[in-house]
């Protein structure tokens, strides 16, 4: 018998067992209870189906296991009931509800045959999953390097309210100044979109997925002569139109930050000088 969702009881005497889970586990919640004796009552949701012995090894301590009969929400609530609680509850990971978007993605990428049957959906699901994992790591750990003074300056500017004119232009001609690392870090935030430059239609297509996002444009040195000033002005003016695959567009009231990371200075024949705030690396 194999399943994704399980309920478990772990009897013990003495110190409360410390449960530790790995990447095979999507979500778990448990607490110390006492009725006639001390035990851990819990729920575990795996990323893919597993047999009982495997789940026992994941939890440790030879727990009593049962395949979940109701919904994961009901089981999770029961595992956190107050009546018999001594300590806890404690949790691990993120609960995936049945029918949720994230659950569908996880189910799609679990079966390699989907790569052949639905290659476009499979690739998008893989990309979404990898991005979601990277976002969690960024949220937990913060920027993984010591901040340069210019990075601290930019972070200070981003804490201010954006306006409808200023584009923050980070200029570093030499390379190895932390621009791309910093840009990717910002791009992992949920209210930011990271773009490595490109054509207007390609970038507006990406932006339409989250049109209220702040935009980070990290321009590779080899593309410096093809800087897309049209896109910068469009998104700063909050007029976003994409004709890629299907026509879609919107005029938005919110103001956003636009950050350009480049090895060159802006061309003032192509963009108004009063729009640009230069930060030197």
Curated annotation (Swiss-Prot):
Subcellular location: Host nucleus
Residues reported to bind ATP: 178-180
Biological processes, Gene Ontology terms: DNA replication
EC numbers: 2.7.7.-, 3.1.21.-, 3.6.1.-
Domain spans labelled CRESS-DNA virus Rep endonuclease: 1-95
Catalytic activity: ATP + H2O = ADP + phosphate + H(+)
Motif RCR-3 boundaries: 78-81
UniProt GO MF annotations: ATP binding; ATP hydrolysis activity; DNA binding; endonuclease activity; metal ion binding; nucleotidyltransferase activity; RNA binding; RNA helicase activity
Record keywords: ATP-binding, Covalent protein-DNA linkage, DNA replication, DNA-binding, Endonuclease, Helicase, Host nucleus, Hydrolase, Metal-binding, Multifunctional enzyme, Nuclease, Nucleotide-binding, Nucleotidyltransferase, Transferase
Source organism superkingdom: Viruses
Segments carrying motif RCR-1: 7-10
Cofactor(s) required for function per UniProt: Mg(2+); Mn(2+)
Stated role: Initiates and terminates the replication only of its own subviral DNA molecule. The closed circular ssDNA genome is first converted to a superhelical dsDNA. Rep binds a specific hairpin at the genome origin of replication. Introduces an endonucleolytic nick within the intergenic region of the genome, thereby initiating the rolling circle replication (RCR). Following cleavage, binds covalently to the 5'-phosphate of DNA as a tyrosyl ester. The cleavage gives rise to a free 3'-OH that serves as a primer for the cellular DNA polymerase.
Entry note about domains: There are 3 rolling circle replication (RCR) motifs. RCR-2 is probably involved in metal coordination. RCR-3 is required for phosphodiester bond cleavage for initiation of RCR.
Record protein name field: Para-Rep C9
Source species of the chain: Faba bean necrotic yellows C9 alphasatellite
Gene that encodes it: C9
């Amino acid at each position: 018998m194999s399943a994704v969702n399980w309920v478990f009881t772990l009897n013990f005497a003495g110190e409360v067992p410390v449960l530790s889970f790995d990447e095979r586990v999507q979500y778990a919640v448990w607490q110390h209870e006492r009725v006639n004796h001390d035990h851990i009552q819990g729920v575990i949701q795996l990323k893919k189906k597993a047999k009982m012995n495997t789940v026992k090894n994941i939890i440790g301590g030879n727990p009593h296991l049962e395949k979940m009969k109701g919904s994961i929400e009901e089981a999770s609530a029961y595992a956190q009931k107050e009546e018999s609680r001594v300590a806890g509850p404690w949790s691990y990971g993120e609960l995936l509800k049945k029918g949720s978007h994230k659950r569908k993605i996880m189910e799609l990428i679990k079966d390699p045959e989907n790569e052949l049957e639905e290659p476009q959906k499979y690739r998008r699901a893989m990309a979404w999953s990898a991005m979601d994992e990277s976002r969690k790591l960024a949220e937990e750990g913060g920027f993984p390097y010591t901040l340069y003074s210019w990075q601290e300056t930019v972070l200070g500017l981003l804490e201010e309210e954006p306006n409808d004119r200023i584009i923050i232009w980070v200029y570093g001609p030499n390379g190895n100044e932390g621009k791309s690392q910093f840009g990717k870090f910002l791009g992992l935030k949920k209210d930011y979109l990271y773009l490595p430059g490109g054509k207007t239609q390609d970038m507006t297509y990406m932006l339409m997925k989250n049109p209220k996002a702040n935009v980070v444009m990290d321009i590779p040195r080899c593309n410096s002569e093809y800087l897309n000033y049209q896109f910068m002005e469009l998104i700063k003016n909050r007029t976003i139109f994409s004709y890629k695959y299907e026509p879609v567009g919107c005029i938005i009231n919110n103001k956003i930050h636009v950050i350009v990371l480049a090895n060159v200075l802006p061309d003032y024949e192509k963009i108004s000088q009063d729009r640009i705030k230069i930060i030197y690396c």
